[in-house]
Amino acid sequence: RIITPLTSMGVKIQSNSGKLPIKIFSSNLKSIEYELPIASAQVKSCLILAALDGNGRTVLKEKIKTRDHTEIMLNELGAKISSNSHIIINPLDTDLKPFHVNIPGDPSSAAFFASAAALLPNSDLTIKNLLANSTRIGFFHVLEKMGAIVTWQNMRKEIGEIVGDVNIKSQPLSGIDLQGEIIPSIIDEIPIIALLATQADSPTCVRNAEELRHKESDRIDAICHNI
């Protein structure tokens, strides 16, 4: 998925039919216009970083918006990236600025603790200093829609990113239908959502999650087998 667009940018890549071993030869990078075939923040971030060294403006098109940490941080450090209907990356005309940052908690890791709190009767859990980027907290919206009580507080910013504390209180859970634009923001949390669904009082259905088959393993298959 990354070889094709990088080749279009002028990178010479030798691979074993798209698999390892792989050789990459440095070259002058060209600007491109490219539509990501699958919603993938990893592929998008690779192309953004490459585009910073391009010879002109690169335009990336997403069918569904994915997490935007790369764009936020690079803009805070001096890059010129705009993101509306398309992502437009201008090549760097100066070095990125040095920075200090307190790295917030990862929402995907926090999802396991939040799930335990939602399932255990009379639980009341607060997770502090958690990243609250809107493209990453879809899980907490899902948890709330399933019936848990979810409250955000102490909101602030760290290098352009929203950070806060989240409180979860247990309540009986109901099933939910998940599809479309929310999927990229919960793609890593679907396995734990599947576990929550086994304890809900009605069925849960997840659609448009084909990206799970292209992770380090086929996570859809793993979810079905493990549960």
Question: Which residues fall in each region the model found?
Answer:
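Structural preference for solvent-exposed beta-strand-turn elements
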Residues: R1-N226
